[in-house]
Amino acid sequence: MIVGTVADLQGRVEVVLRIADQDDRTIECVVDTGFQGELALPPAIVALLGLPTGGRMWAKLADDSHASVPVFSADILWDDQEVRVTVMAMGSRPLLGTELLQGFNLSADFEEDGQLLLTPL
């Protein structure tokens, strides 16, 4: 089970990134059910972390436009397991998408400091 919080009416989950030759980094991500990828991080954070590049891919944005965005790989701790994910370098805040939510039930108490739970199906 993964436990998060609700703040400013947004579900949030902390994601631990495991990067070679660095200490683990914890990043708070907004759970975005409209984002079908795994993780999206602002380009400045991706650069700071020094993630290995994976090229570019097309992304459909919230305004229905399309953009070619750089992608990177990262290992994260997800429900106590190390998992390799694709990170899209885009946007202004870290997002966790539905590809990581597959196989989980999402429930949230939508009030300030409410609890968000991701439980395996």
Regions found by a protein language model. Name each.
Residues 1-121:
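Pepsin/retropepsin-fold aspartyl endopeptidases
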